[in-house]
Amino acid sequence: MLQFTPPLQPATLILRYKRFLADIVTPAGEALTIHCANTGAMTGCATPGDTIWYSTSDNPKRKYPQSWELTQTQTGDWICVNTMRANELVNLAIEKNQIAELSGYNFVRKEVKYGEENSRIDLLLQAEDRRDCYIEVKSVTLLQQQCGYFPDAVTLRGQKHLRELQNRVVNGHRAVLFFAVLHTGIKQVAPARHIDRRYAELLVQAQQAGVEVICYGFQLSPDGIELNTRLPLLLDEMLSSENAE
């Protein structure tokens, strides 16, 4: 488990703005402006009135020492809005041998430069007796009609990552797109064709070329975050739609 130390503190969300900032009010009535480590649309994750949980940094150089970590929605779901946690969570689960699909490697390297488009891979797994495994981690928090979608906004960077992963397979390596589902209401995952059609098309192409797509849910609470169960990826309906066109 990734434990929050010191413990997170609750507050009520007033407004998220300028992408990286949010105004909150603590239970004691103190108004704070905190940092939001999420560049996405955060649809359904930032409703005014939601309870949010924040961490506090001891770095004296930070202008906004508090960071928004979790949202507890008014419908009872928990969401990790700090996208920087996704890589940390997947790396921790791999090191603890909790993900069977990614077990058996001796070394884990982070943020390694690679590819034809000047990219950095989130995690690179290596072992003497197997192919290098390139892992791109994506945080999934968009819940619509009982399904989790990625991305929540058009992502040219995400499109590039899919091309790079496909090229890794062509070059004889193993490539994995890992969807870290950080919303407790999400029970299945699909590409957000209605938001970023090109990303969805590239995802289908990448999987057909041999890129593995793995989706896992996580248990979330103010105490910490822990790997839960594997979740299904829905591509059949999209493939049917593509073929019809």
From Swiss-Prot:
Signal peptide: none annotated. One of its GO terms (molecular function) is DNA binding. Pfam families: SfsA, SfsA_N. InterPro entries: SfsA (IPR005224), SfsA_C (IPR040452), SfsA_N (IPR041465). Gene3D superfamilies: 2.40.50.580, 3.40.1350.60. Belongs to the SfsA family. This is Sugar fermentation stimulation protein homolog. It comes from Yersinia pestis.
